[in-house]
Amino acid sequence: MEKQKILFVSQEIYPYLPETEMSVIGRYLPQGIQEKKREIRAFMPRYGSINERRNQLHEVIRLSGMNIIIDDSDHSLLIKVASIQSGRMQVYFIDNEDFFHRKGILTDKDGKYYPDNDERAIFFARGVLETVKKLRWSPELVHCHGWITSLVPLYLKHAFKEDPLFAKSKVVYSV
């Protein structure tokens, strides 16, 4: 019998970001699912505060190179990957210099939300789904964790509804 395929899309995953309730869930929930003999792919944004060298992120050339258009502007999509050795789990990172190379995750140093967080969420959601398409991987369940992932279900229901890879995908959303 084939393993159930689960796409886990998270706003934060520990140890790549500081330990918070959200990042800890983002870290251990996918591992627990994988330990139950499910096939899981985890995605998160590649925020500027993530140290690529220390966390051993590297670009996946065959998945990178797409452009995503938002408001008539082209934005290059880079896909990076790293492993959490203790959990035997890979994490894919959606990267773009314009949207994610900032020290703050969602807010600036004064605690104000970035004015383009909506575009960042659009880019992230579309980047995840386009990458999954490029992988030719058909998830049975898509679990979205955190508000920056909230557009993924909308895209699945509307923009990707005719795509056979997502035809049978069910969605779970948690915050």
Residue ranges with predicted function:
Residues 1-175:
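Catalytic cores of nucleotide-sugar-dependent glycosyltransferases that transfer UDP/GDP/TDP-activated
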